[in-house]
Amino acid sequence: MRKKLLSILLVLSLMLALVPAAFAADIASGTCGAEGDGSNVTWTLDETGLLTISGTGKIASGTGGSIWSDKPVLAVDIRSGVTGVGKDAFYGCDDLQVISLPDTVTQLDDNALGNCPALSDILVDAKNPAYKSVDGALYSKDGTVLVKGPANAETFVVPDGVATIGDYAFFGAKYLTSIYFPEGSLTTIGAMAFEFCEGLTELLLPAGVTEIGMYAFAHCSGLRSVDLPVSLKHVSDMAFLSAGTMDAGIADINYAGSEQQWNAIAFEDGVLGWMHKNFNTEQHTFGAWVTDGTRSCAQGVTMARSCGNDGCDLVQTVELPALGHIWDSGTLLAAPDGVRCGIVEHTCGRCNGTGYEVLDPEIWAYEQFGDVDPTLWSYEGIQFCVMMGFMSGMDTHVFAPRGVTTRA
């Protein structure tokens, strides 16, 4: 059924379902509970690409990828009662755009949402005690840990107050070209946090960062320049493995401290040892971000911050697009029939705004009367009058009386 959208904002949205729930049929189902939970956790996938997971217990870990990686999953709705998401549970769901977590999910295992390149939004129930969502990204409830960023983002600004970029936070975010870190709060870059972010070309790690986890920037093939602060104390195994390419690797490591201080850093491997290093480089110290508005479903913002060092005129400017509505599958207010359009009311999962959708009238199959010539100009009018109850045939195949219907 072709659908028309009344709200222009609907064009900008990511739909949780492509047709109203009343019209969507399930195409697959099964169980997905972790060991001990077994059949207590069930799933259904409907024809719109909406995967609904319900029950009690934890979703099982993936084995070499998600059990749904070969299915057309566009959105995931995890219902209250599910308590956790296993390792690699949704790994490799290439088309997944939106996932919603209920109040009861308090555990996400390693890379549960890994390698989902289209993922733009993670929504969290406001009553969840462990997690919260801000602009589509997933954070610990207190906002100090960035658990998972939007995988399809090109630019991301880590907000003030974040102390840790979690393990796998941007793993495989192949579209990411720019990442901006907060001043004064960030201390730790987790394991595999930016692995396979091939679009990154530059890193400016702020003062205060003390630890870089294993494989944190491994296979970032586009990386050319890295600024490291004097606060750095520990760099884990293979943190920059295969960063840059064989022909054009990282050109410069700019370190704010002395060579003696560099040698005191605990490196677990020699990946950075052969790279060219510039010591005692001046480290940028940025002020607070200034924005020209509030980012919302319908409105983007421009952000800017300046380096406060004497003689430095560097200004970082970032344009962030509107977030876009995330519509639910909708409530059918009026069903379409052979004459009237139907109306579906959608609610945005992010801003609680309302949008309306118009469904075209049903194309009813005309009943075939043996005594009414389908080529007559009056044929469709007769069928319409029968269907609307204005008149009826003698039986299901005879309209009667016989004769030619003439124009008035």
Predicted segment positions?
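Bacterial N-terminal signal peptides
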Residues: L9-A17
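Extracellular/surface recognition and adhesion modules
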Residues: L14, W43, I53, V76, ...
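Sec-dependent signal peptide cleavage junction
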Residues: L16-A28
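Surface-exposed repetitive/solenoidal architectures
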Residues: A25-D94, A169-G172, F196, A218, ...
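Structural signature of tandem-repeat unit edges
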Residues: D46-T56, K71-G84, D94-Q107, C116-G136, ...
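Consensus positions within tandem repeat domains that build extended binding/scaffold surfaces
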Residues: K87-A89, D110-A112, D167-A169, G190-A193, ...
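Extracellular modular ligand-binding repeats in secreted and cell-surface proteins
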Residues: V157, G161, E282-W364
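Short, solvent-exposed alpha-helical surface patches in non-cytosolic proteins
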Residues: L376-M388, D395-A408
